[in-house]
């Protein structure tokens, strides 16, 4: 049996429901995990300031992994940030503008979007509770840990394959984040690296880690934890890369596994779960 001590979960299309809402019993579940000395981390492409506003009742219990691993905060202390070089993201901004896509510079305190794309404000505010609209993104001087591209037509995978992967993959960490987003971070920055760093800091081995996700920006995280779960609604090719499947997010699949873990006192073995392949 393995005793789980650290759990990380993606949010959109994983922990959250179809309306981007948390399960109603999420807060008491995390508190019950904490009582068993099990840490819970929200691992998201959203920034830290948005995550803090999402979990006001769990600021002491939860670890926050923001911007796909670009920043980590626990109990009010920022443990890690990976600031992108300005010359790098300015080049990305020009490339995105030429392609006709929407660039989002993820600053540590706010997101920056060019004013010509203010029509997408409702979409931006779903993920970035602070957005500053500027005339020219390349003129921004604030530190940033992620550069995100919004694809309104839902063609993120195609844009990644044709343009952003080949053009940026050698210099940056690039990942598709659902149908509408491509995320770009410093090389080596992803949710899996953040989870591994947390494991080192807390002295928790991979065999005592559990993780949940649905798409490609979760892949390394699901491979880092021994108990990595792809929710059933997740990207099909990832089933070959992860050990286990959880029920889909609309059935609160993450919560089903967490409740099973609690019922077993925090101890599990691989035979307890449905294999992904």
Go through each PLM region and give its residues.
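Residue-level signal for inorganic ion chemistry
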Residues: 33, 44, 68, 147, ...
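Conserved acidic, metal-coordinating active-site core of Asp-based
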Residues: 95, 99-221, 233
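Extreme N-terminal segment that seeds HTH/winged-HTH DNA-binding domains in transcriptional regulators
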Residues: 1-11, 15
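Short active-site oxyanion
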Residues: 35-41, 60-62, 146, 207-209, ...
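Mg2+-dependent phosphoryl-transfer enzymes with acidic/Ser/Thr/Gly-rich catalytic loops
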Residues: 2-6, 22-23, 183-277
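Active-site phosphate-binding/coordination module
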Residues: 21-120
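Hydrophobic packing residues within well-ordered alpha-helices of enzyme cores
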Residues: 26, 51-55, 159, 163, ...
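Short, structured coil segments at secondary-structure junctions
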Residues: 57-60, 68, 167-170, 224-225, ...
């Amino acid at each position: 049996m393995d005793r789980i001590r650290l759990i990380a979960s993606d949010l959109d299309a994983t922990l959250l429901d179809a309306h981007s809402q948390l399960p109603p019993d999420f807060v008491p579940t995390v508190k019950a995990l904490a009582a068993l000395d099990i840490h819970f981390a929200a691992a998201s492409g959203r920034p830290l300031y948005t995550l803090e506003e999402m979990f006001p009742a769990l600021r002491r219990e939860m670890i926050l992994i923001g911007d796909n691993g670009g920043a980590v905060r626990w109990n009010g202390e920022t443990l890690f940030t990976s600031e992108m070089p300005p010359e790098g993201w300015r080049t990305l901004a020009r490339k995105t503008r030429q392609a006709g896509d929407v660039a989002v510079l993820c600053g540590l305190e706010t997101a920056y979007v060019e004013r010509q794309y203010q029509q997408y404000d409702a979409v931006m505010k779903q993920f970035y509770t602070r957005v500053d609209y500027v005339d020219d993104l390349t003129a921004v001087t604030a530190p940033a840990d992620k550069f995100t591209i919004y694809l309104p037509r839902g063609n993120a995978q195609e844009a990644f394959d044709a343009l952003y992967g080949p053009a940026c993959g050698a210099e940056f960490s690039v990942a598709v984040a659902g149908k509408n987003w491509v995320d770009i971070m410093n090389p080596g920055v992803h949710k899996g690296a953040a989870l591994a760093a947390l494991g080192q800091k807390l002295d928790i081995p991979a065999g005592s880690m559990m993780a949940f996700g649905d798409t490609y920006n979760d892949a390394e995280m699901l491979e880092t934890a021994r108990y990595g779960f792809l929710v059933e609604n997740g990207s099909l090719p990832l089933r070959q890369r992860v050990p286990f499947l959880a029920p889909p997010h609309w059935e609160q699949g993450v919560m089903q596994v967490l409740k099973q873990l609690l019922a077993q006192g925090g101890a599990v073995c691989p035979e307890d779960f449905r294999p992904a392949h």
